[in-house]
């Protein structure tokens, strides 16, 4: 039996350049050109880890993502992800067109869908116009 990690990359439908770059790198087992919610709702998974870096900034309400990851995975697992940090109570569409999410909002999703928050750290994620964008790094267990 050959057991190895499986890596999937979701590419939004309008991001052809991103898809081409990912193909050139040849590091992903599968490139998926589909909306993440649609994909999560049609597949059954057996993953230990779901890792989502710089993905949730393009999704405002994360309820469906949290619900589908937990309900469509055969066993418990871990969800690691980054968000742009918002100091309010929920999520917010920034001028950049990206969403930011508050820790309080993520904690509410954890309570609603049965995740345990194992790690949260505020970190600078990237520079935009010579200013750091603050983010949250999360590790959840379910």
Predicted ranges, named:
Residues 51-52:
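A conserved beta-strand element that flanks and buttresses the S-adenosyl-L-methionine
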Residues 98-114, 118-120:
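Short alpha-helix
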Residues 63-78:
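A short glycine-rich, Lys/Arg-flanked "PGG" loop and its adjoining helix->strand segment in the class I
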Residues 57-58:
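A short His-aromatic
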Residues 113, 124-142:
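Core SAM-dependent methyltransferase catalytic element
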Residues 1-39:
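Class I SAM-dependent methyltransferase SAM/SAH-binding core
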Residues 80-99:
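Short, glycine-/aromatic-enriched active-site segment of Class I SAM-dependent methyltransferases
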Residues 28, 46-48:
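Local beta-strand N-terminus motif with an aromatic residue
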């Amino acid at each position: 039996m050959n057991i190895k990690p499986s890596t999937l990359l979701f590419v939004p439908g309008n991001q052809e350049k991103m898809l081409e770059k990912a193909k050139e790198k040849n590091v992903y087992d599968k490139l998926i050109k589909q909306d993440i919610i649609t994909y999560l709702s049609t597949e059954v998974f057996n993953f230990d880890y779901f890792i989502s870096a710089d993905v949730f900034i393009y999704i405002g309400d994360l309820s469906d993502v949290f619900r589908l990851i937990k309900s469509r995975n055969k066993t418990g697992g871990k969800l690691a992800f980054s968000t742009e940090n918002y100091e309010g109570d929920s999520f917010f569409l920034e001028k950049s067109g990206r969403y930011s999410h508050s820790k309080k909002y993520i904690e509410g999703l954890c309570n609603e869908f049965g995740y345990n928050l194992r790690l949260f750290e505020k970190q600078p994620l990237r520079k935009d116009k010579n200013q750091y964008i603050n983010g949250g790094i999360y590790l959840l267990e379910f």
